[in-house]
Amino acid sequence: HVQHLALIYQPQNDAVGCELVVNRSLYRGYSHFAGELGFLPFNHDGLKGETLQRSPQLLLEKQIETLCCVFNPEYVVIYSEVLKDKQDFNLTSIPIMHQPKIDWIEDIDKLILIGLYQLALDHLKEGDI
């Protein structure tokens, strides 16, 4: 069973995001900001939108390398509305032993429903509902 996983969502607009799973539990961070890849420093001053249109694979590579350094996931799963073909990634700044397995998903709708279900369960457990 995978313990540490990152799911990257790359839409056609620049609202890229990521879900982080730590020890098989969704990690949100103290202010629920964990996974907001669009705010990484190399995405500043509108460059993110330009890079997304010009070189979406390069943008994903930078995001994956950042995740490897900060989070060190075993798997990175990607859903991209921009890259239609599965790509091989050039993660040269990350030593091979620290590179994650990378997989692609075709349909994110099912995962969104599962995530919403899990959020509702979490709120019930915490007594928020």
Stretch-by-stretch model annotation:
Residues 1-45:
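Phosphate-binding/catalytic loop of phosphoryl-transfer enzymes
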Residues 26, 44-129:
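ATP-binding/phosphotransfer module of carbohydrate and carboxylate kinases, centering on a glycine-rich
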